[in-house]
């Protein structure tokens, strides 16, 4: 007898709650349809549901996100790097205390080698037709960052191999909830043909019809709740095997209705979050402005805070990291979150004078200053002018429009080509292609769990 099983999946919501009421309505509607046809449907979230750029998530350290997943009655979740490395250790340890669903991650441990109390390496689920589905889960191993937060993250592929060995003789179907990204997921499909489906995330790919790799179906639904994915499995329950598998996505902009209850719940949580973030941090005696393409007060204040916090010789901060001004008078946690919502941590790198000068030259180009940035933790619009503390950078605009750096001093002394300097900056510059010499620096120290807005708060209390 042939039966259909649906696996609905969300990934990388990043606390874009504006789409969540539609997602809830869509999944609830589909559940009703499948129930009428006596067909089973399961629902999964594949991580990065949390993002502290959103003030409700910030105020509750992600617990409202877990509330939303509870209310949707999901069957299981994986964790992403936003759950894993943007929360203080004690907040991640408590994040899923009230979860009504299993959180599946096999490669995360505390420093004593124990899994978090809420984590399981896999789930064996008995389906309505009596077949058994093994649900595995892994997260992307950002080793040095997890280590700084007193967690141990291990190789995901080794854990997938171990988990398959444990479940393969007991499972009719094996699926993987993977927060690794498409390149690693394709490699996992090649390495582990025992997997039937990989529900993937992290790299925000939209696989409208899935992707078949080595007989393994990969499915991903982009980001921000723009889509919900659905994997449809056609199963021969008598032979206990899958005979067909396919993937699709639903564009939420085309879904006409939303859950009124969910919308009301979120509005209530917004009011509560505003109260939680109303604590006064400090008082400004005058307005503090931000200008993205020239030096201004707030980016300069952040640069000074970064230099002092990290104990670096100099610091460098792009002006676009500050999204708006602050008015004179009391400054609250909500104010600081509004102007600096990014889940970005301080970092120091060690650069020779030659490499530092090259980086400063690159930062001064119009191409970099005007660059529109997406990802890397940045939740703003544009890079903007680089602002320094501990360094004086003199530039001039040439006739051809190119900006030239004509003079650099470090704490009053001319920059020395062979001397090694400690530079405080943003962890986003250690990733991607923005500043290769920072990214490739051998000596880096991450300062965690504090975000940049925490440094601003600290500076304002001085």
Regions inferred by a protein language model and the residue ranges of each:
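Acidic, metal/ion-coordinating pockets
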Residues: 1-251, 295-300, 305, 446, ...
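Active-site proximal loops enriched in glycine and acidic residues that flank catalytic Cys/His/Asp
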Residues: 9-11, 202, 222, 318-320, ...
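Feature captures C-terminal
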Residues: 17, 327-462
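A short, polar/proline- and glycine-enriched secondary-structure boundary/capping micro-motif
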Residues: 144-148, 230, 253-260, 326-328, ...
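Metal-centered catalytic cores of metalloenzymes
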Residues: 169, 308, 423
């Amino acid at each position: 007898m042939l039966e259909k099983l649906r696996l609905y999946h969300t990934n990388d919501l990043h606390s874009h709650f504006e789409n969540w009421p539609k997602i809830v309505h869509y999944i609830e509607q589909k559940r009703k349809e499948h129930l009428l046809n006596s067909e089973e449907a399961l629902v999964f979230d594949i991580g990065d549901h949390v993002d502290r750029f959103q003030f409700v998530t910030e105020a509750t350290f992600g617990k409202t996100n877990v509330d939303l997943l509870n209310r949707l009655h999901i069957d299981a979740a994986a964790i992403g790097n936003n759950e894993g490395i943007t929360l203080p250790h004690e907040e991640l340890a408590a994040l899923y205390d009230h979860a009504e669903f299993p959180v599946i991650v096999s490669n995360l441990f505390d420093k004593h080698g124990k899994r978090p109390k809420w984590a399981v390496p896999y789930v064996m689920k008995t389906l309505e037709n009596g077949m058994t589905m093994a649900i595995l889960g892994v997260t992307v191993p950002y080793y040095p960052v997890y280590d700084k937060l007193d967690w141990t993250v291990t190789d995901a592929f080794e854990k997938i191999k171990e988990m398959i060995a444990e479940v393969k003789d007991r499972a009719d179907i094996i699926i993987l909830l993977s927060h690794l990204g498409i390149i690693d997921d394709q490699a996992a499909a090649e390495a582990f043909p025992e997997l039937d489906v990989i529900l993937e995330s992290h790299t925000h790919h939209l696989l409208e019809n899935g992707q078949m790799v080595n007989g393994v179906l990969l499915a991903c639904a982009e980001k921000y709740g723009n889509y919900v994915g659905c994997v449809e499995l056609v199963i021969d329950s008598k032979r206990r095997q899958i005979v067909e598998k396919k993937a699709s996505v639903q564009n939420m902009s085309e879904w006409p209705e939303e859950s009124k209850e969910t919308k009301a719940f979120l509005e209530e949580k917004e009011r509560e979050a505003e109260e939680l973030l109303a604590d006064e941090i400090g008082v400004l005696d005058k307005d503090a402005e931000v200008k993205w393409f020239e030096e201004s007060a707030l980016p300069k204040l952040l640069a000074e805070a970064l230099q002092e916090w990290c104990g670096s010789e100099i610091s460098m901060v792009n002006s676009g990291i500050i999204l708006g001004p602050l008015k004179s008078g009391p400054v609250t946690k909500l104010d600081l979150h509004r102007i600096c919502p990014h889940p970005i941590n301080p970092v120091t790198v060690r650069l020779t004078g030659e490499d530092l000068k090259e980086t400063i030259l690159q930062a001064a180009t119009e191409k970099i200053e005007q660059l529109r940035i997406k990802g890397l933790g940045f939740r703003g619009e544009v890079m903007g002018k680089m602002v320094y503390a501990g360094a004086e950078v003199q530039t001039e605009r040439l006739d051809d429009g190119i900006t030239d750096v004509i003079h650099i001093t470090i704490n009053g002394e001319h920059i020395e080509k062979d001397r090694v300097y400690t530079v405080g900056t943003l962890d986003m510059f250690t990733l991607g292609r923005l500043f290769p010499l920072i990214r490739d620096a051998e000596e880096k120290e991450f300062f965690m769990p504090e975000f940049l807005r925490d440094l601003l708060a600290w500076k304002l209390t001085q």
